[in-house]
A protein has these predicted regions:
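Short loop/turn and low-complexity linker motifs enriched in small/turn-promoting residues
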Residues: 2-170
């Protein structure tokens, strides 16, 4: 076969590949949400409070320990479960109990959840409990208007000075 025919065949193969690639880059049409829906993303990491408080060892307790283990303050590593609730218009949209990861159950619990909701004006209530006793440690209520096809992100920051808690980004 002659050299020009090889180049022509190779060019046609590349052109055919480009046409197929171009077709599948735009077709079939895909929509990630129905036309009248918006998306709520709940995403954050949070290390809960310790299950047991730190305590100081007495001199008698320290004397019983090996010399290399004599640390006055003892802090158990295990953390509490994180309970997260998200309500929309008075109805529970999401509820989860997150167990702390790690061998000692001392890691930060992580959450990532996509929740499709109808577009429009809604009242959201986000709650988080990160200690064993008592009710929810953090509660945030917000009236938000969600446009169709838009994404709202709900984040959580416990270390924000002045206003720790949930952050709604619309």
């Amino acid at each position: 076969m002659s050299q020009p025919l090889k180049y022509l065949g190779q060019g046609l193969a590349y052109a055919l590949f480009a046409v197929v690639l171009g077709f599948f880059s735009t077709s079939p049409e895909y929509t990630h949400l129905p036309a009248d829906y918006a998306l709520v993303k709940l995403s954050f990491n949070h290390a809960a409070q310790r299950k047991k408080p730190c305590y100081e060892r007495t001199d008698v307790e320290l004397a019983k320990l090996a010399p290399n283990m004599r640390i006055r303050k003892d802090c158990p590593r295990e953390r509490s479960d994180v309970v997260v609730e998200l309500d929309m218009d008075g109805k529970q949209l999401y509820h989860v109990v997150l167990h702390p990861p790690g061998l000692s159950h001392d890691g930060a619990a992580s959450i990532y959840r996509r929740l499709p909701v109808p577009a429009g004006a809604h009242r959201f209530v986000a709650r988080l409990k990160d200690k064993e006793e008592g009710g929810f440690s953090f509660v945030r209520e917000e009236n938000i208007t969600l446009a169709a096809g838009r994404v709202m992100v709900i984040d959580f920051k416990a270390d924000v000075p002045g206003a720790p808690g949930f952050i709604f980004k619309n």
